[in-house]
Amino acid sequence: MSALSSGTGNVEQGIGASGVSVTYIGHASFLWTAPDDTRVLIDPYQDPDDGPEWFDGPFPPVVADLAVSTHDHFDHNAVDKVSGSPVLLTGPGEFETPGIRVTAVPEVHAGKWVMPNSLVVVEAGGVKFVHCGDNRFDFDPEAVASVGQVDVVMVAVDDSQHLMSWDEGWQLAMAFSPRVIVPMHYLLPGVVKASSTLLGIEKWLASLPDDVVVRRLDGPKTTFSGDVLPPRQETPDTRQSPQVWVFGSVLTID
């Protein structure tokens, strides 16, 4: 397993070609299990020290080799709650094993919360992801260019437009020319409480362009691979919108 480094150069295309398992823990937290069994967790959550509770319970007992926080807000920064004595990545840096590469690219939080936020690139099983955390839509073009084209983007959207408008969320996601958009950071029964003031995503889904295919997954876990991802439309004449994949619930950790 590699040591963590602070490099943030251009991100190369994903390693391997066998696919990678991704589990949606809830809110903005996802777990990748690479072909070499390396486990990478992004944005474990916790309730705030004061104010209304956001979550229906404590963060579940997830074991990981690397725990990543995109930024230092309570609902993204509970890396100390992760089991397995993971390596921690809480700012720009890199992590790599034979089966997975993770690169955190420095950017900025959306809205009134002007603070650092990392765009976290995960490459495994021949698939390239970017987890946007709570990133702004009016991003630094150089930061986004360093990430490059991805297969899957995780973006924060909900019907309350808590972080940014639906159009702004779409603009952020499309900057990476993804094949699939995965929504996150919304009201999810059993995980996120209504007292968070977040809402669901049904109105957001209804607002999407007419050619967007919405795929609702059966549960919180799926395998992403070249065989299951939609084909990339390479020419302007045949270009189509990406698909939107919505993870199901409720989570069971194995």
Residue ranges and their predicted role:
Residues 3-17, 77-126, 209-232, 237-240:
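Metallo-beta-lactamase
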Residues 109-176, 187-189, 193:
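Active-site-proximal loop/helix segments of hydrolase catalytic cores
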Residues 114, 176, 180-254:
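Binuclear metal-ion centers of metallo-dependent hydrolases, dominated by the metallo-beta-lactamase
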Residues 1-36, 227-230, 246-254:
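Zn-dependent metallo-beta-lactamase
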Residues 24, 164, 196:
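Soluble or luminal CAZymes and related metallo-dependent hydrolases
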Residues 41-45, 63-79, 105, 130-133, ...:
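Active-site neighborhood of phospho(di)ester-bond hydrolases with catalytic His/Asp-centered motifs
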Residues 5-14, 25, 29-66, 76-87, ...:
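Pre-active-site segment of Zn-dependent metallo-hydrolases
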Residues 21-24, 39-43, 100-108, 119-121, ...:
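Active-site-proximal beta-strand elements of phosphoester/diester hydrolases
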